[in-house]
């Protein structure tokens, strides 16, 4: 699972004149890119995107024959890489005539338009290194049992992978991805959009259970989640999955809402996915912040969760209920019904003990004033004991964190 799974671009004279200036300096970060003549094996070890970047550098330097050699090596390793095939055609044509644009066609087909979009997305990825010393603001806290977290940045067609070492998160890799044909913010069945929110990988579907369209496998996520359902959003079947055998990668907006990776990248990703726990944060653009800001946000939300636990344990029902928002729902009851039930239940108890562990705290993307808390709840009282995995959605209401939704996860 390497960082190499990040970048490349293809194109012809007019398109490359702009793109290659932007990516040229960054290509030097690949040590092999400075070699006079890297071997095919060296290029393939660097990964498909890096191989294409090397070819583009050669095109910028007017080394058409060398670029063609690079591309042919890339195609030999990945014969179904359609973008590379298009670049090869451009390079062959460049020997005899100037090229106007990628694909060298003014009346481009839908496929050519898609490949041009992929080329632009690859350049954008190449230019957008994860900021050093910064982290996505969403991932406030992961339990030690959750080893990795995923954050999708749709603006850059990139899925970032972060590793949890028990004390902090570290960027380890990223992958080019395809999202829905109509962009983000899924609302209803069939709108061909990818949802924005906090989700989790809930199952694994092996290749044997799928058609070839989904490639090497699929990992469904829990869309619609509780917040989606509260807002009346519907639809189903949002997966992370691969590509058909005859397709290396797809344009940045080409799915029916799923998150699509190359089969090689999905195979790498599958090694670290934990069914039932790996969080997947999907956003339009990542908000990168300092570790100090994350710590402040984490402490603020952790304090709210702890105060809720303490007030529940105290059997002071009034104090306990002050932690719930005016528009609270558990899926069946609103705040008034919830209040009445809690007063009745707590009146019958002589003591309550509430323990929480394996706490996950995540800010909701696009909603600066909302967060998701998931934890193991160990409840014991004078007449009932149970243990459940609980999920709460917290919002800022009148300057304080309050619970908008609560239920079993």
Region locations from a protein language model:
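Short beta-strand edge/turn micro-motifs at domain boundaries
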Residues: 386-409
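Alpha-helical linker/edge segments of TPR/alpha-solenoid repeat scaffolds
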Residues: 92-137, 351-354
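Exported/periplasmic cell-wall-interacting domains
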Residues: 203-306
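Gly/Pro-biased beta-strand-loop elements
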Residues: 127-238, 244-249
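Short, aromatic-enriched amphipathic alpha-helices that serve as compact interaction elements
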Residues: 55, 297-316, 323
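Surface-exposed, charged secondary-structure patches
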Residues: 343-391
């Amino acid at each position: 699972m390497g960082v190499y799974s990040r970048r490349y671009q293809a194109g012809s004279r007019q398109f490359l004149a702009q793109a290659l200036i932007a990516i040229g300096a960054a290509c030097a970060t690949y040590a092999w890119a400075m070699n006079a003549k890297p071997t095919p094996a060296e290029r393939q070890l660097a990964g498909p995107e890096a191989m294409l970047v090397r070819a583009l550098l050669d095109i910028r330097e007017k080394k058409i024959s060398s670029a063609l050699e690079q591309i042919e090596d890339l195609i030999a390793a990945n014969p179904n890489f359609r973008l590379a095939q298009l670049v090869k055609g451009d390079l062959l044509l460049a020997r005899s005539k100037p090229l106007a644009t990628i694909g060298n066609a003014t009346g481009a087909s839908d496929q050519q338009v898609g490949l041009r979009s992929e080329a632009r997305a690859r350049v954008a990825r190449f230019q957008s290194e994860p900021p050093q010393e910064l982290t996505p603001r969403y991932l406030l806290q992961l339990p030690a049992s959750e080893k990795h977290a995923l954050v999708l940045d749709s603006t850059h067609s990139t899925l970032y992978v972060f590793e949890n070492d028990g004390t902090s998160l570290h960027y380890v890799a990223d992958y080019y991805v395809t999202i829905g044909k109509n962009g983000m913010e899924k609302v209803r069945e069939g709108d061909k959009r990818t949802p924005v929110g906090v989700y989790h990988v809930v199952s694994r579907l092996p290749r044997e259970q799928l058609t070839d369209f989904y490639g090497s496998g699929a990992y469904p996520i829990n869309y619609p989640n509780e917040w989606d359902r509260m807002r009346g959003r519907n639809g189903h079947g949002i997966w992370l999955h691969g590509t058909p055998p005859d397709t290396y990668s797809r344009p940045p907006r080409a799915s029916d809402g799923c998150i699509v990776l190359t089969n090689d990248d999905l195979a790498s990703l599958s090694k670290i996915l934990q069914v039932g726990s790996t969080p997947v944060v999907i956003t339009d653009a990542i908000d990168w912040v300092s570790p100090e800001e994350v710590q402040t946000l984490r402490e603020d939300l952790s304090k709210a969760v702890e105060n809720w636990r303490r007030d529940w344990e105290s059997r002071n029902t009034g104090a306990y209920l002050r932690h719930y928002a005016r528009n609270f729902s558990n899926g069946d009851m609103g705040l008034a019904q919830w209040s009445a039930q809690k007063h009745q239940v707590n009146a019958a108890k002589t003591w309550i003990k509430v323990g929480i562990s394996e706490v996950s705290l995540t800010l909701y993307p696009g909603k600066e004033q909302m967060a998701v808390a998931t934890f193991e709840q160990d409840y014991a009282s004078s007449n009932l004991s149970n243990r459940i995995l609980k999920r709460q959605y917290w919002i800022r209401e009148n300057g304080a964190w309050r619970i908008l939704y609560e239920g079993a996860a």
